[in-house]
Amino acid sequence: MRQWPLRHVDMRTRVGSVSLPNPVLTASGTAGHGAELGSYVDLASLGAVVVKSLAAEPWAGNPAPRVHETPAGMINSVGLQGPGVSRWVEDELPALVNRGARVVASIWGRRVEDYARAAALLVGVPGVVAVEVNVSCPNLDDRSRMFAHSATATFDAVAATAVCGLPRWVKLSPNVADLVDIAGAGLNAGAEALVLINTLLAMAIDPRRGTYRLGSGSGGGGLSGPAIRPVAVRAVHDCRAAFATVGIVGVGGVTRGIDAVEMLMAGADAVEVGTATFREPRAPVQVLAGLQRWCRWNGVERVRSIVGVVHKAAAESQSIAVTQSTDATTGDDHG
């Protein structure tokens, strides 16, 4: 660590073609439609605000209870409740735009055509800089198997959203054995960035009553928070190793600036802060401040310079090892 911190750090980043003033965003589904945090956070100071996933039509979501706290996070089964894209554009988006927020609209569907309809409703909408395609949804045309659990279904869902004319980021599930292949399908369908990761499948049972703790019953819910951060870091790392130039947003258990540093070093261009806002609504700006402070004290003049450094270090180490091996062999030949 430096004796004296840098006075200035360039915090700008890019996710695909989208330029952002800094790499800290809110995560979809953890702050309502974004404006709810406005009493605690200057939304314009964040990289972007990612809103709760929206379907083409209003959706009621799952029955209560919807949330259960765990030792290192929470399980939710909200069920993607929302007013629908059109109502959101009319009632919720103006408040975000007026606050100077850069908005990422998240959409979902139960069939491929649902994704197309939701995307079409975002054409020409002001203030939206990108569309996050949430494919962690049951596909009614595939026995309710998650779109995100199939490379083919992921491709079809993402391809259907091209009508929006905006940069698209595909948000993927970690509950698969072939994440890199599925990520590749999303990219081949037109997504220019990966959002890694969505929640892990989870369940909670009340031992006293012998009943499910969540209203979704045997459907369980999704685990988020610090418990899943190592899984998210691994997903970011592996996808960055496979796709050197695409945009990557790391999400899952980011609660401190140092967590953001880890995600960026694994290969993320930006991070999303979600579950942490339930405990501390100012968490996104605190993470941003912590990240900036770390950069200042560690002599990092541009935050983008630490993106993927672990891959660069590994490549350099391998290169040195090969060189040393070659030198040793050459020495033996001339011994």
Language model regions located:
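N-terminal capping/small domains of soluble enzymes
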Residues: 1-103, 108-110
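Hydrophobic faces of well-ordered beta-strands that scaffold small-molecule active sites
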Residues: 24-28, 47-51, 103-107, 131-133, ...
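Glycine-rich beta-to-alpha transition loops that act as phosphate-gripper elements at the mouths
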Residues: 31, 106-109, 172-178, 229, ...
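Catalytic cores of alpha/beta
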Residues: 35-40, 115-125, 176-189, 241-243, ...
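Glycine-rich phosphate-binding active-site loops on the catalytic face of alpha/beta enzymes
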Residues: 51-56, 134-137, 193-203, 253-254, ...
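C-terminal helical cap(s) of enzyme catalytic domains, especially alpha/beta-barrels
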Residues: 61-71, 205-220, 277-300
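Glycine/Thr-rich beta-alpha phosphate-binding loop at enzyme active sites
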Residues: 74-75, 137-152, 182-246, 282
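Alpha-helix-loop-beta-strand connector modules within alpha/beta enzyme cores
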Residues: 83-100, 148-170, 214-248, 287-301
